[in-house]
Amino acid sequence: IINNAVVFLPAKNLLYDATKDKGSRLNGNKIQTGNNTIVNGSRILASESQNSSKLWRNTPPAIERHFRSSLAYRLCLVAEGRFDGMMTLRPTWEWDVAAGNLICTEAGCDVKTQDGGNPLYNEKIPKMNGMIAGNPILVDNLLSYIK
Protein backbone atom coordinates (compact mmCIF):
# COMPACT_ATOMS: atom_id res chain seq x y z
CA ILE A 1 0.00 0.00 0.00
CA ILE A 2 1.31 3.41 -0.93
CA ASN A 3 0.35 6.04 1.64
CA ASN A 4 2.33 9.10 0.51
CA ALA A 5 3.70 10.17 -2.84
CA VAL A 6 5.71 13.02 -4.31
CA VAL A 7 6.73 13.76 -7.89
CA PHE A 8 8.94 16.84 -8.24
CA LEU A 9 9.95 18.41 -11.53
CA PRO A 10 12.44 21.11 -10.50
CA ALA A 11 13.01 22.47 -14.02
CA LYS A 12 9.27 23.18 -14.26
CA ASN A 13 8.85 24.13 -10.59
CA LEU A 14 6.08 21.52 -10.26
CA LEU A 15 5.54 19.56 -7.06
CA TYR A 16 2.78 16.93 -7.11
CA ASP A 17 1.94 15.19 -3.86
CA ALA A 18 -0.73 12.95 -2.41
CA THR A 19 -1.62 11.30 0.86
CA LYS A 20 -3.91 8.28 0.96
CA ASP A 21 -7.54 9.35 1.51
CA LYS A 22 -6.59 13.05 1.56
CA GLY A 23 -6.41 13.95 -2.13
CA SER A 24 -3.73 15.12 -4.54
CA ARG A 25 -2.14 18.51 -4.95
CA LEU A 26 -0.02 20.44 -7.42
CA ASN A 27 2.12 23.11 -5.74
CA GLY A 28 -0.25 22.95 -2.75
CA ASN A 29 -3.50 23.28 -4.74
CA LYS A 30 -5.99 20.41 -4.92
CA ILE A 31 -6.20 18.70 -8.33
CA GLN A 32 -8.81 16.48 -9.93
CA THR A 33 -8.84 14.35 -13.06
CA GLY A 34 -10.98 15.19 -16.07
CA ASN A 35 -14.37 13.72 -16.92
CA ASN A 36 -14.04 12.63 -20.57
CA THR A 37 -15.29 9.06 -20.99
CA ILE A 38 -15.12 8.70 -24.79
CA VAL A 39 -12.04 6.95 -26.19
CA ASN A 40 -12.14 8.30 -29.75
CA GLY A 41 -10.81 11.84 -29.71
CA SER A 42 -9.50 11.57 -26.15
CA ARG A 43 -6.16 13.15 -25.28
CA ILE A 44 -3.94 10.24 -24.22
CA LEU A 45 -0.30 10.31 -23.13
CA ALA A 46 1.37 7.33 -24.79
CA SER A 47 4.41 6.46 -26.86
CA GLU A 48 4.24 6.00 -30.62
CA SER A 49 4.59 2.22 -30.19
CA GLN A 50 1.11 2.12 -28.61
CA ASN A 51 -0.35 2.55 -32.11
CA SER A 52 0.79 -0.94 -33.12
CA SER A 53 -2.21 -2.94 -34.33
CA LYS A 54 -0.91 -6.06 -32.54
CA LEU A 55 -1.84 -4.45 -29.19
CA TRP A 56 -5.48 -3.84 -30.06
CA ARG A 57 -8.49 -6.10 -30.63
CA ASN A 58 -9.29 -4.38 -33.89
CA THR A 59 -7.80 -1.16 -35.18
CA PRO A 60 -6.29 1.22 -32.62
CA PRO A 61 -8.79 3.80 -31.37
CA ALA A 62 -8.64 7.31 -32.82
CA ILE A 63 -7.00 8.98 -29.85
CA GLU A 64 -5.13 12.27 -29.85
CA ARG A 65 -1.75 10.93 -28.75
CA HIS A 66 0.72 13.06 -26.80
CA PHE A 67 4.06 12.07 -25.32
CA ARG A 68 6.08 12.79 -22.20
CA SER A 69 8.92 10.40 -21.46
CA SER A 70 8.39 10.12 -17.69
CA LEU A 71 5.62 7.72 -16.66
CA ALA A 72 5.34 9.47 -13.29
CA TYR A 73 4.84 12.83 -15.03
CA ARG A 74 2.26 11.31 -17.40
CA LEU A 75 0.27 10.06 -14.41
CA CYS A 76 0.47 13.48 -12.75
CA LEU A 77 -0.73 15.26 -15.90
CA VAL A 78 -3.76 12.97 -15.98
CA ALA A 79 -4.35 13.55 -12.26
CA GLU A 80 -4.52 17.31 -12.80
CA GLY A 81 -6.86 16.93 -15.79
CA ARG A 82 -4.51 18.28 -18.47
CA PHE A 83 -4.89 14.99 -20.38
CA ASP A 84 -7.73 12.47 -20.40
CA GLY A 85 -5.57 9.43 -19.80
CA MET A 86 -2.21 7.73 -20.09
CA MET A 87 -1.16 4.29 -21.09
CA THR A 88 1.89 2.17 -21.55
CA LEU A 89 1.25 -1.28 -22.97
CA ARG A 90 4.61 -2.77 -22.14
CA PRO A 91 6.19 -4.06 -18.93
CA THR A 92 6.57 -1.24 -16.42
CA TRP A 93 8.91 -1.03 -13.43
CA GLU A 94 6.94 -0.32 -10.26
CA TRP A 95 9.33 2.44 -9.12
CA ASP A 96 8.49 4.40 -12.29
CA VAL A 97 4.77 4.52 -11.49
CA ALA A 98 4.22 4.03 -7.74
CA ALA A 99 4.09 7.71 -6.76
CA GLY A 100 2.10 8.69 -9.85
CA ASN A 101 -0.36 5.90 -9.14
CA LEU A 102 -1.31 7.34 -5.73
CA ILE A 103 -1.38 10.90 -7.08
CA CYS A 104 -3.75 9.72 -9.83
CA THR A 105 -6.08 7.70 -7.64
CA GLU A 106 -6.31 10.47 -5.06
CA ALA A 107 -7.32 12.84 -7.89
CA GLY A 108 -10.21 10.55 -8.90
CA CYS A 109 -8.51 8.38 -11.52
CA ASP A 110 -8.67 4.66 -11.92
CA VAL A 111 -5.28 3.05 -12.50
CA LYS A 112 -5.15 -0.45 -13.96
CA THR A 113 -2.61 -2.79 -15.48
CA GLN A 114 -2.95 -3.67 -19.15
CA ASP A 115 -4.94 -6.80 -18.27
CA GLY A 116 -7.41 -4.80 -16.13
CA GLY A 117 -5.98 -5.70 -12.74
CA ASN A 118 -4.98 -3.40 -9.93
CA PRO A 119 -1.26 -2.54 -9.82
CA LEU A 120 0.60 -4.52 -7.17
CA TYR A 121 3.78 -3.29 -5.53
CA ASN A 122 6.70 -4.90 -3.70
CA GLU A 123 6.39 -7.99 -5.86
CA LYS A 124 9.23 -10.50 -6.22
CA ILE A 125 9.66 -9.26 -9.80
CA PRO A 126 9.04 -5.49 -9.53
CA LYS A 127 7.50 -5.17 -12.96
CA MET A 128 3.86 -4.94 -13.95
CA ASN A 129 2.04 -5.60 -17.20
CA GLY A 130 1.68 -2.05 -18.49
CA MET A 131 -0.54 0.66 -17.05
CA ILE A 132 -3.63 2.64 -18.02
CA ALA A 133 -4.95 5.62 -16.05
CA GLY A 134 -7.79 8.10 -16.39
CA ASN A 135 -11.27 8.58 -15.06
CA PRO A 136 -12.82 5.19 -14.27
CA ILE A 137 -15.21 5.05 -17.23
CA LEU A 138 -12.53 6.05 -19.74
CA VAL A 139 -10.16 3.41 -18.34
CA ASP A 140 -12.84 0.71 -18.72
CA ASN A 141 -13.54 1.90 -22.27
CA LEU A 142 -9.83 1.85 -23.17
CA LEU A 143 -9.43 -1.63 -21.71
CA SER A 144 -12.23 -2.90 -23.98
CA TYR A 145 -10.03 -2.09 -27.01
CA ILE A 146 -6.90 -3.88 -25.77
CA LYS A 147 -6.07 -7.50 -26.61
Regions flagged by a language model, labelled:
Residues 1-27:
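DPxDG-like acidic metal-binding loop motif
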Residues 32-147:
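An extended, acidic
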